[in-house]
Amino acid sequence: QATPIKPDTSKNLHIDNIDKKLSNVLHDLFNSSKLTESAKVKIASAFFSPAGFIKISEPLTKISKVQILLGTEPNSNKGQWDKKLEENEAAFIKRQLQESIENQDKYIKKERDYFPFDQASSSSVKTMLTALKTGNIEVRRYEKNFLHAKAYLFKEDEHPENSVIIGSSNLTANGLSANLELNVSNHDPEVIKETEQWFDRLWDESVPFNLASYFEEIFTPRDPFVIFLKVLWELYGEEVLEEYIQDKKLPLTDFQKHGVERALRL
């Protein structure tokens, strides 16, 4: 039997992705689990990306209970948040939240669409989908307010490395390994207990989030003609776009404009 990996969290550590990468610390921490029924992981993150999740997904699929709580953040476009004359404060915040939720959905889809299409990446996504569908990984989104917190909690009965890591890193590839971040791990049982209570309270107020549905589309069979058009666009898209910009100076009928726009959306 292989010797369990001892995670580098034996004391309170600063994790900044320079000397230590959070993805490596979390990977080793989750891999150190004895895989008992008491093992649990709870993650809160304002942002999410598939590339970030896959960095730590392999050990997560083995843990009996994993909860991921996603939040939303206000759009950086300040002009978008101008309060309308007819809005009271509650309506204004509600609109902000709704638009941020929609922006997050678009962001996840964009990250998915730009995810590398190779054998290793496809295998990782399939592993993630299996975990999401079998039920040991559950995802919810907090939609009552903007959730900006980032926390990674691991807990298991009689495990020497129970800990919570709190800081600035989102559950994204950059947050876990590339950006200059600052996170601190803490092993104080009271801190872990209070953080878990905080998490559970928000979890109970959150709504289920079908993360699997975003990635199932990757493996949906595609029309060969659409794939052919995609290949053409990758090869000649820039030239076509330049010609399109030039042609926009010429008058087009409505149906011609509609046809061009549809072609670009493909």
What are the language-model segments listed below?
Residues 1-261:
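PLD/PLD-like phosphodiesterase catalytic module centered on the HKD motif
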Residues 262-266:
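Phosphate-binding P-loop
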